[in-house]
Amino acid sequence: MLAESLIRRELLPEVKISLPKIQTADTLLLKKLRFDIPKIDSFIGLAAADLCCVSGYGANLLLTRLCVRSLLPERYGGLNSPYVMVADASNHTDVYGTVNFARQYGMSKKDVAERILVVRAFTVHQVRRLISVELPKIVQKYQVRSVIVPGLLNAFDEDPIMRIKDIKKEISRITEAINELSARVLVVTSVQQGGRHSDLVLCAFKKRINLLQNEKQGTLKAEIYNQGDSKVVNLTEREFKIIPKT
């Protein structure tokens, strides 16, 4: 989630890369991406081919954290992804947050910037085309193992004239495309809590985290849903922003 130059990266000459190794379903299931937040990791894990939705207060920060962690080697709870794809449907890419997490993990800011590919979409049509047509090509071309989609439904929430029938049809198409993509790579998206159309998609995510501010300042509650099971944990904002020392 760094720099506007990343948006133009897709227009540069194709990078010569080796073909990805064929991964079996068992291999994909064994690989796990950790949030590096023990209270969350103890209840939910993200496989190399998986789908998760984050909503509520601090959702973008959590996606930024996962974006950087996806680049880490597997022995550190990452996916060792050559590149991470950020399909920004809300214009919420967090440059400062990305740099901050890269610094905490001792990673080169330049290396992180070069390995995070950002493409923005602003209209419903652009979002659908990006997710259903462009993302599968980018995933294949750059050996992407992690796709981050901030603000999945923002374009719908900001369109005042789109008919509900058309909204449901487009959301169904986008959800179907995301499900197909998550059979190949990890896809993590965010949906605005209380958004006009959030109820149309939240039920489609078997893995989901909803973040709520507590009355006590500097704390929040995480409602975690994992394939039919659920758990509520209390967290501090510091646990979201600062990685634990090992």
Task: Give the location of each predicted region.
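Short, well-ordered alpha-helix to beta-strand connector turns
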Residues: 49-50, 81, 113, 182, ...
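Hydrophobic/aromatic beta-strand patches that form the interior of the parallel beta-sheet core
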Residues: 52, 85-87, 117-119, 186, ...
